[in-house]
Amino acid sequence: MSKNVSRTVEQLAEPIVRELHLELVEVEYKKEGPNWYLRVFIDADRGVNLDDCEAVSEKLSEVLDEVDPIKEAYFLEVSSPGAERPLKKEADVKKAVGKGVYVTTYEPIDGQKAFEGVLVSFEDATLVIEGKNKTRTVTYTVPYAKVANARLSILL
């Protein structure tokens, strides 16, 4: 049920977010304790501020009240995905070239399923990540088809 709600809300939110010159990163609908939360994550190249979140929240609330795709009571939260935003689409990965990333895979590649470092390139559906293995620099080649999760990472 929550995946269907998320997909429906994505379809409703996308034109609103685009009209405000923002990007819809993710929609999450989940129960935490006794409450349901509808979380809408937005971003922009310039960053996201409180006014952006408020504008999306107000416009989306109007549409949700009209269409009423969610039967139970819920809390609507609109926010930035944060510094370690998820990389959900290929376009997100392309924009992350030159930045720190953390990637997990469905199956091991050279004996490991987690990779962290700088995304050097993303070409031909392959991520090239330059990371550290103790004291030496290592280059990992990860096929995009094997990526389970990817997000930006703050490298220290």
Swiss-Prot record:
Domain of life: Bacteria
Name recorded for this polypeptide: Ribosome maturation factor RimP
Function summary: Required for maturation of 30S ribosomal subunits.
Lyase recorded as keyword: no
Keywords tagged on the record: Cytoplasm, Ribosome biogenesis
SUPFAM superfamilies per UniProt: YhbC-like, C-terminal domain, YhbC-like, N-terminal domain
GO terms for cellular component: cytosol
Major localisation: cytoplasm
